């Protein structure tokens, strides 16, 4: 006997269309800039039922977003440069985070429910890097990064009956920062 309930399934359509344009500006042998802009049209449709199986849930989100980027490089020598960059990006809710149904997650031994009120998160990304190119195909770079999130999506939990139930919410703001070291070394000398 099939015991599938209306609230156990949903249908969805996801459309993302994008266009990107950029321009390079070389002010001198030492200083160059790349400026870009990305436009995205996003349409998300979800049809299903709330967890009671009685209330239809229809989501139809249409958005147009603009994401600028700027990358400035200053060449100290032909093998050394400093780079500063900015870019804006987005983190859209995944289907499982936004659909109005409950599923059991065996990794955390708890039910997880979606949240139809989730907003997308916008991220402003800032980078500062020093790059060194000792030989062709080799790179050493050291960087600092800072990311500022608006409406980040977080998993939260609450007591539900005899256990815990997880869901997703938007926090107001979050930041992430750190350092990066990247080394690309040609190992052809090993044979």
Placement of each model-derived feature along the sequence:
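Signature of Gram-negative outer-membrane beta-barrel scaffolds
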Residues: 1-77, 103
């Amino acid at each position: 006997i099939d015991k599938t309930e209306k609230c156990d399934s949903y249908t969805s359509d996801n459309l993302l269309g994008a266009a990107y344009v950029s321009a390079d500006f070389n002010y001198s042998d030492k200083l160059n800039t790349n400026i870009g802009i990305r436009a995205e049209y996003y349409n998300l449709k979800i049809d299903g039922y709330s967890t009671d199986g009685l209330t239809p849930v229809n989501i139809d989100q249409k958005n147009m977003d603009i994401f600028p980027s700027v990358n400035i490089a200053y060449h100290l020598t032909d093998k050394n440069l400093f780079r500063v960059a900015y870019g804006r990006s987005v983190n859209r809710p995944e289907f499982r985070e936004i659909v109005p149904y409950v599923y059991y997650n065996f990794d955390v031994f708890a039910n997880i429910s979606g949240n139809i009120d989730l907003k997308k998160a916008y991220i402003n990304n800032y980078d500062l890097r020093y790059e060194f190119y000792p030989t062709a195909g080799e790179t050493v770079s050291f960087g600092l990064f800072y990311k500022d999130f608006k409406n980040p999506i977080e998993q939260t939990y609450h007591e539900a009956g005899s256990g815990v139930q997880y869901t997703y919410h938007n926090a107001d703001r979050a930041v992430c920062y750190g350092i990066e070291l990247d080394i690309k070394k040609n190992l052809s000398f090993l044979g």
